[in-house]
């Protein structure tokens, strides 16, 4: 994501790398809801529908859940296909929680709803993509939270 919180995090975690910044892995465009809390929007009927997962509702001047999911999935599939084609076996994506939760809900095994993949800032997941499984079923194995809690406590 080109947003500062992602580019700065990437520089801290991987100072020797020259990351490729991909705009289509940005967080959902919340339009006029950006910067407002759920409490601020509590009386907004569209916000309540959006929060309940209605894919047709979008924030004013923003992006619907369906459009957001379509955008990030198209980009993610392109990235995975490129990694498989080049034989790349390790890669990192530094992006936002909403992007991570949505991608894992769409492609992750075990299957879970987006909110079940929530994590604290600075955390993520390690996944394994097996080319044959990906090409057949478009799924990936989610196998650990990173960094592990013990890494932080040391």
What are these regions (language model features)?
Residues 98-101, 109:
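Short Gly/Pro-enriched loop/turn and capping motifs at secondary-structure junctions
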Residues 12, 102-106:
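Active-site signature of alpha/beta-hydrolase-fold catalytic machinery across serine-
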Residues 28-39, 81-89, 105-154:
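Acidic, low-complexity terminal tails and accessory targeting/binding regions
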Residues 1-46:
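Phosphate-coordination/substrate-recognition cap region in phosphate-metabolizing enzymes
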Residues 87-97:
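Generic beta-sheet signal
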Residues 69, 73-84, 104:
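Generic structural signal for well-ordered alpha-helical scaffold segments
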Residues 48-67:
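Short glycine/proline- and acidic residue-enriched helix-loop micro-motifs
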Residues 1, 70, 94-95:
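Short beta-strand scaffold positions
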């Amino acid at each position: 994501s080109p947003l500062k919180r992602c580019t700065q995090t990437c520089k801290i975690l991987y100072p020797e790398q020259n990351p490729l910044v991909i705009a289509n892995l940005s967080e959902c465009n919340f339009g006029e809801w950006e910067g407002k809390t759920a409490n601020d929007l509590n009386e907004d009927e569209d916000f309540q529908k959006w929060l309940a997962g209605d894919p047709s509702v979008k924030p004013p001047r923003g992006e619907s859940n369906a459009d957001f999911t379509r955008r990030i999935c198209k980009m993610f599939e392109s990235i995975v296909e490129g990694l498989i084609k080049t034989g790349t076996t390790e890669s990192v994506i530094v992006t936002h929680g909403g992007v991570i939760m949505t991608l894992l809900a769409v492609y992750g095994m075990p299957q879970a709803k987006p909110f079940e993949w929530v994590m604290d800032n600075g955390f993520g997941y390690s996944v394994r993509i097996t080319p044959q499984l990906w090409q057949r079923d478009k799924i990936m194995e989610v196998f650990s939270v990173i960094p592990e809690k013990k890494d932080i406590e040391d």
